[in-house]
Every structure is written in C-alpha cells, then in structure tokens.
Amino acid sequence: MPRIESGAYRLGQLLLTKHKEENFANIARGWSLLAEGGTLVCSGSNDDGAASLEKQVGKAFGLDGTLSKFHCRVFWLTRADRAPPDYWRELASLRPVGDGSWLSQPGIFAWDRIDDGSALLATYLPEDLSGHVADFGCGWGYLSREALARSPGIAKIDLLDAEHRAIEAARANITDTRASFQWLDLTQEAAPATYDAIVCNPPFHAGRAAEPGLGQNVIAAAARVLRPGGRFYMVANRGLPYEPLLKANFTSFETLADNNKFRVSRAIR
C-alpha cells in the first residue's frame, strides 16, 4: 500500500513477514507514526521468525507484553524515549544498494541484488523491441532498464507491480521519459493496455510457500494483452509448470536458455 508519510496515532498494528530487514523497516516506520505513549502491536508466525524478532525488538525498545499460541505470537511496545536503531530507520527508505547505481528497500523482490534469473533473461533480450512494451512484475526496474538500454525502438514501457514499494523504487531508478509506472496486481486486475512485447520474471511465492498459480495467472494475463505476433520474454525456475500454459496460450514458444536452475522462454502470441 502507499506509505503514510506522517501521523500521531494512538495505536498501530503490524503484520510481520518472513523477511527480517523488512520487519525492521516496518517497525521503525510504525514507531515513527505513533504519538508519544502510543502502542505498536506486532503479530506473526514463528515459522517466519517472529520468536527471534520478538527478542530483538525487546532489546531495542523493551516490550509491554507478549502472547504465543498456535505457532504464532503477538508482542507490543509503547513509544517512549527509546528510538529504533539507526539501521532499522535506514531500511525504511529507498537507499543505494548493489553497486550504488540503483535504489531499493526491503519488501521488494531481490531488494539488495540483481536476481540471477532476471540477469539471465536480460542477456537474451533482443535489440529490436519496439512499440509499446510492458514489464510484468517489474520489481525495482532492472529488466525495464535493460530493455530500454538495448532497444531504442521502444516507444513506451509500462512497469507494473503489485508491491507499491517496488513501483516507488522503479520510478526512482528509471528516469527515461518512455517509462510509466502503475501499481497493479496482475493476478486480480486487468493490464492497462495492449502490448507489442512483454518481459517478465513472474512471482511464485506467497509468504514462504511456493505458489505456481501466481506465475500462471501472470502468464495468462500477458497472453490476453499481447497483440497478434507480440513477443513474451520470460524467465522462471525450471521446475515450475509453465510450459503447458505457454503451449496453450501462444502460437509458438521456444526455450532460449536452460542452465539447470532457470529457463528463459520466448513465446509468440
């Protein structure tokens, strides 16, 4: 969701995730939005590291109370004179990462690195992409940046992602006027246009669990909005069941690369 930039709330509630740095950032943000004496309630699964996080938050702030049941826990703290560690606060905003040429933050896919699968796909992006292009599940913008650099014929590229923080990061990382940005969940919402080409590293996790259906929904969405003859470039973990969907929804497809971990495919609508 879009960030709440300021506030003085008496109560805040935070659902913890599986990512430690994201939790640090969210707790720092939640604390900053509390009024003096306000309470922040955090809840999460022990499988996602909530027990360990509870100890770290207790050391940083002191806790007012905890509850534990059904492999989950809740703990809460009061905003008083102890502020979040500086590192936690830094994680709550976009910051230079990697080689320093791009900005990101926890909560974005592969937030502090170039994903290996995306890097492999980028090497197979052609130099003749043109017209209206889209990046489905754009993350912080790596594939779009590579596509724009390789293909001067691109007239416009739409960057779409279900994570609002990813869109904020992509907007900061790509200043090319051909790029536009939209916060949109392609598994639930229709893409905003039809396209001559789409690049994609589809999501396949919900929490810690693998959910191939997420990627399948994104592939189906791409097939619906590609123009006849349009090209779909995709990378995925090679064990995911995507080929039957490519075969059913596209005129043809081929494997461009297979390194025993990732598979790069090109499909023609």
Label for each model-derived stretch:
Residues 68-132:
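SAM-dependent Rossmann-like transferase core, predominantly class I methyltransferases
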Residues 197-224:
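Mobile active-site "lid"/loop adjacent to the S-adenosyl-L-methionine
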Residues 116-200, 206:
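Conserved SAM/SAH cofactor-binding pocket of Class I
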Residues 24-36, 215-228:
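A short glycine-rich, Lys/Arg-flanked "PGG" loop and its adjoining helix->strand segment in the class I
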Residues 45, 161-165, 214, 237-238:
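Short beta->alpha hinge that forms the Motif I/post-I loop of the SAM-binding pocket
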Residues 9-15, 195-203, 233:
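Short SAM/SAH-binding signature in class I
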Residues 22-97:
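N-terminal auxiliary segments of SAM/dcSAM-dependent transferases
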Residues 38, 155, 230:
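Glycine-centered, small-residue-biased loops immediately flanking beta-strands
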